[in-house]
Amino acid sequence: MSRQTPARKRRKKYSEKSDAIYHNRLVNMLVNRILKNGKKALAYKIFYRSMKTIYENTNINPLLIIRQAIQTLTPKVMVKARRVTGTTHQIPIDVKPKQGTILAIRWLLESSRKRSGQTMHDKLSHEIMDAARNKGHAIRKKEETHKMAESNRAXAHYR
């Protein structure tokens, strides 16, 4: 007779909280990526100021523009290095929706930090508006990733 352990209790998945004003998880994800050195109040301040700037420039709900920007930035495929018989191949893999959103937010913030001049909330708002219009450095990063995956399509069988 074999001993079987009782069924393990399933842990609840961590649900990301939403912010106080917009009540949106995407906003919370963005703010948590803006965050540096534990200064969450400053991260919220930067985010809300950029929302205000977006609204002043477009007269459209800034949340819609952020969703559109992140949707256009979300990659469908990416490459992953895999070592096969002594050589490293870049293998294209599909990106899950959650991971794609995380990558899009990361690229958006990296490209907004690289912009010259201005304050962070101005740089962030301009990068978000550019991404929504399918322009900007973050869009180039996405296209570069897709191009890499396309050129390494022959190595897809190594998955």
Swiss-Prot record:
The gene is rps7. One of the primary rRNA binding proteins, it binds directly to 16S rRNA where it nucleates assembly of the head domain of the 30S subunit. CDD domains: uS7_Chloroplast (cd14871). This is Small ribosomal subunit protein uS7c. Part of the 30S ribosomal subunit. SUPFAM superfamilies: Ribosomal protein S7. GO terms for cellular component: chloroplast; small ribosomal subunit. It comes from the Eukaryota. One of its GO terms (molecular function) is structural constituent of ribosome.
